[in-house]
Amino acid sequence: MLKKVVAAAAATGGLVLAGAGMAVADSGAQGAAVHSPGVLSGNVVQVPVHVPVNVCGNTISVIGLLNPAFGNVCINK
């Protein structure tokens, strides 16, 4: 029983840490073509993509007024 609890806690912690990588992603393009020997070799074309996504306060509940996310204000920056 204890082994299952420890395994479940470790799996949950791993999923939480794996999701943290998505939260620190950057939308800036920073590619570089270094030491390219020809005219057409090593050309880099990157387009920075920024899509503001508002995901705070989006929960599903049966009774919306008792929801802890009710009344939250979210702003896209």
UniProtKB/Swiss-Prot annotation:
Disruption phenotype: A single chpH disruption and double chpC-chpH knockout have no visible or sporulation phenotype; a quadruple chpA-chpC-chpD-chpH knockout has delayed aerial hyphae formation and sporulation. A quintuple chpA-chpB-chpC-chpD-chpH knockout has a longer delay in aerial hyphae formation and an almost complete lack of sporulation. The quintuple knockout still expresses ChpE, ChpF and ChpG. Quintuple knockout chpA-chpB-chpC-chpD-chpH has strongly delayed aerial hyphae formation, makes many fewer aerial hyphae but no effect on viability of the spores produced. One of 8 partially redundant surface-active proteins required for efficient formation of aerial mycelium; the short chaplins assemble into a hydrophobic, amyloidal fibrillar surface layer that envelopes and protects aerial hyphae and spores, presumably anchored to the long chaplins. Chaplins have an overlapping function with the surface-active SapB peptide; chaplins are essential on minimal medium while on rich medium both chaplins and SapB are required for efficient aerial hyphae formation. Chaplins are also involved in cell attachment to a hydrophobic surface. It is found in: Cell surface; Secreted, Cell wall; Fimbrium. One of its GO terms (cellular component) is cell surface. This is Chaplin-H. Disulfide bonds join 56-74. Coiled coil: none annotated. Residues 36-76 form the Chaplin domain. GO terms for biological process: cell adhesion.
